[in-house]
Every structure is written in C-alpha cells, then in structure tokens.
Swiss-Prot record:
Keywords: Secreted, Toxin. This is Toxin To58. It comes from Tityus obscurus (Amazonian scorpion). The keyword Secreted applies. It is found in: Secreted. GO terms for molecular function: toxin activity. Its main location: secreted. GO terms for cellular component: extracellular region. Expressed by the venom gland. Signal peptide: none annotated.
Amino acid sequence: KKFGGFLXXI
C-alpha cells in the first residue's frame, strides 16, 4: 500500500 493501493497492496 505505497501508491494508493497499487502493487497490490504493498
């Protein structure tokens, strides 16, 4: 969850 929920949630 670094970029608003992009990357899957990282």
